[in-house]
């Protein structure tokens, strides 16, 4: 090997070494940052996240998918006359209603369910993953587990599920469905959401996102095996994107939210992504007009921005609209008191 060749290899080795050192330093910096966050006082450290349970059931849908359903709260002849049905969002599970279950279960009959391919429900391997199918799933949950009047509560994709129910089963609203709460959700045009990025960057992201998500979905098993290695980054992203007051949010709560997201297989993320981007139910909102409706959104929600909730409120002028300050997308976890109080108020407004 000539002196020149050795010099070239030496330079290349130095560059690779420097790059590796840079990556390692960045990883250590992230780990250090997360470590410091976890050392802060944590008021939620003893909260039993993921431990609350009701009476567990399995519902086989008309297309053969097993849904996990839990019924909580009063039962029997002396039970509550009204059922509150909680519909969770994309990449979450029924556990995301932890605080609402904890605070409402003594007085109200609750039905919580994991949407297909989420939580403890079966993966819809060959089944439909459209928003319309989620609306049909909800109709089957109501038929099986809700014998009387109910209030529907939906967060994010769960709100879209309720809109699909209204579009496909409008006859249920007014008689069976007596009230609706739509939290941090959208009636459509999610492909135009900027995610807080500059317009040109956002446009570029949306242009490549469908192909990228589809590609990751095809390699889902491989991606899932590497997700744990990026847990510090996932923690920081969840903290930043999910919570408006991210500097003061409980690390235990962030871990809980991130664990639900991480438990959602990459293939499921890819399966549902096109349905979310194509979701358009603004024309179905009129079905909700006869029933008391509450619309809530955080003012720092970048995933389903406040403008989307305002558009729904304009379509439902009788709805009670609330924009919660210093709050992002995981509103029921970040501001549980405000959300639970709004649900109690909605229940009071519902005639049984």
Residue ranges and their predicted role:
Residues 217-287:
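Conserved alpha/beta-hydrolase catalytic His-Asp/Glu region
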Residues 171, 175-222:
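Flexible "cap/lid" loop of the alpha/beta hydrolase fold
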Residues 310, 314-352:
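Catalytic active-site module of serine/aspartate enzymes centered on a nucleophile-bearing elbow/loop
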Residues 73-76, 118-175, 187, 193, ...:
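Active-site loop/oxyanion-hole signature of alpha/beta-hydrolase fold enzymes
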Residues 5-34:
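Hydrophobic alpha-helical topogenic segments used for membrane insertion/localization
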Residues 65-123, 141:
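Conserved HGGG/HGGXW glycine-rich cap/lid loop of the alpha/beta-hydrolase fold
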Residues 276, 299-304:
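Acidic catalytic loop of the alpha/beta-hydrolase fold
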Residues 288-289, 295-297, 301:
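Short beta-strand/loop motif that positions the catalytic acidic residue
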């Amino acid at each position: 090997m000539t002196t020149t060749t050795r010099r070239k290899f030496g330079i290349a080795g130095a560059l690779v070494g420097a790059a590796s050192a840079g990556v390692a330093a960045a990883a250590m910096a992230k780990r250090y940052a997360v470590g410091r966050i976890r050392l802060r006082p944590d008021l939620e450290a003893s909260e039993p996240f993921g431990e609350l349970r009701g009476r567990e059931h399995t519902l086989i849908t008309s297309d053969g998918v097993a849904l996990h359903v839990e019924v909580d709260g009063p039962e029997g002849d002396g039970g509550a006359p009204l059922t509150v049905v909680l519909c969770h969002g994309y990449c979450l599970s029924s556990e995301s209603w932890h605080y609402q279950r904890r605070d409402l279960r003594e007085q109200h009959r609750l039905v919580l369910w994991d949407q297909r391919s989420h939580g403890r429900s079966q993966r819809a391997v060959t089944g439909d993953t459209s928003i319309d199918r989620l609306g049909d799933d909800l109709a089957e949950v109501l038929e099986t587990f809700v014998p009387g009047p109910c209030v529907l509560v939906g967060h994010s994709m769960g709100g879209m599920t309720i809109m699909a129910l209204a579009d496909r089963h409008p006859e249920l609203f007014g008689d069976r469905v007596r009230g609706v709460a739509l939290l941090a959700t959208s009636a459509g045009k999610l492909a135009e959401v900027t995610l807080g990025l500059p317009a040109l960057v956002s446009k570029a992201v949306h242009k490549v996102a469908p192909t990228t998500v589809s590609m990751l979905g095809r390699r889902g098993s491989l991606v899932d095996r590497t997700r744990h290695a990026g847990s510090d980054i996932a923690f920081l992203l969840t903290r930043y994107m999910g919570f408006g007051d991210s500097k003061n949010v409980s690390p235990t709560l962030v871990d809980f939210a991130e664990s639900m997201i991480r438990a959602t297989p990459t293939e499921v993320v890819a399966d549902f992504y096109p349905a979310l981007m194509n979701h358009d139910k603004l024309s179905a909102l009129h079905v909700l007009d006869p029933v008391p409706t509450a619309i809530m959104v955080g003012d720092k929600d970048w995933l389903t921005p406040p403008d989307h909730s305002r558009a729904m409120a304009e379509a439902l002028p009788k709805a009670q609209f609330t924009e919660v300050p210093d709050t992002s997308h995981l509103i029921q976890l970040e501001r549980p008191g405000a959300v639970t109080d709004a649900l109690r108020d909605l229940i009071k407004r519902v005639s049984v």
